[in-house]
């Protein structure tokens, strides 16, 4: 609808230029927003205030001329002037109802991408291997997955890339410890304890640390024995990761893994190509790129180091190799990096180096989708009581157990197997939604009691809202036929629900553009609240006549499908009953 209004305004502007009311050459960005007060319209534009000065007119006078120049459109019932010169558009309820009827009959719910489909690389999760995933990996994994799902639903070709840390000092440390204490497969499967023991030896013994560093060199040189053991550790670690992904209901698979080691053979080429492009400068024996726009606090150039004095490579080198691969081989139009906000400077520098070196094709977008920190109740990074790192799998276990206790209290008569199934959906969804519903750039405090509440903007509330819709159709007694009848919007609650349903397409396009799943969460929460008001004020099964009942059933059906689709895109499992 906003696009329609923008087009109408553009046609009016063109007409006013032709009539000499407006000067030629104006190219304003036409802004159309949802009106806050629906009694004053559904949409508002400040275009008259934007162009009043170049037109040499008062904003309200220009607004009157714009209204007179607007072409008629069946989707707009009237346009009014408000305040200093806002244009308020009222949408035609019959046209709105017709759009919702079309959405109900469309598997895509009338959702279409605003623009051409693209090939999009989504870089997400990226845990360091050799130990189990911890809570610090949650945000990248689920935010990236949610955005990837939305992009796919809109028609983009999405290439998930799990850039795992599968190379480096930690593997030398593990190999050295394995030489000292040969372990069985069962012992190795307990990666956390094995890693902890190896790390303790590394910290306490310089001789052990030296041997570990030597094994890293052998590994990088392609030593067969080291590579065999490294592969064993990597496979065990990836198996742990995959179990966690499945628990989280994210779509990452082993085929999406493209770790640091995948780019090893190209790192020397990256350095050579940077040198050939005239970008490299030697500084204290290291190979660096200096970009004028990046400087330290004392105004000295800030280097991007791509090769250490000893010949070793750094994260920047690997990231540059990955960028080139994603551009030249994967042919990506866009690459989204869901990585901690604290890496913002790193990515700004690496992206600029990649562009100057010609590693990305013209028009390719490189975007760092940074996120804040998950904190504990004390406002500090989330830790165990003894100050250790919280394993992600332990967090999910506790969420499920807490959800089980909660659900059992409310439904003591439900069979044990069903209770466990409900608890799994509620517990995992609660953890994910508590994160996804916050702006990704914000820090937030983890609180089990808040996230498991059935009130407020939480997963349990939304899951229950969906079961409430499903309950309407269970009580109907006969299969609902979506091909019959039409939506008619009479009551205010019907109109408000319908207007929000019509914004699903816009909402998903916003998520795709900005990488912000919290926008979808806010939409679904809003929708659930509007359905509740509709349900309480507009009898569905007790409607006044069959036509009204079918209209309201159609509204309920579209609400249910929209809620389910939205929750599914966020990676949340819906339930038919709770």
Curated annotation (Swiss-Prot):
This is Arginine--tRNA ligase. A motif ('HIGH' region) lies at residues 127-137. Pfam families: Arg_tRNA_synt_N (PF03485), DALR_1 (PF05746), tRNA-synt_1d (PF00750). CDD domains: Anticodon_Ia_Arg, ArgRS_core. InterPro entries: aa-tRNA-synth_I_CS, Arg-tRNA-ligase, Arg-tRNA-synth_N, Arg-tRNA-synth_N_sf, ArgRS_core, DALR_anticod-bd, Rossmann-like_a/b/a_fold, tRNAsynth_Ia_anticodon-bd. It is found in: Cytoplasm. The keyword Transport does not apply. It catalyses: tRNA(Arg) + L-arginine + ATP = L-arginyl-tRNA(Arg) + AMP + diphosphate. NCBIfam families: argS. Its EC number is 6.1.1.19. SUPFAM superfamilies: Anticodon-binding domain of a subclass of class I aminoacyl-tRNA synthetases, Arginyl-tRNA synthetase (ArgRS), N-terminal 'additional' domain, Nucleotidylyl transferase.
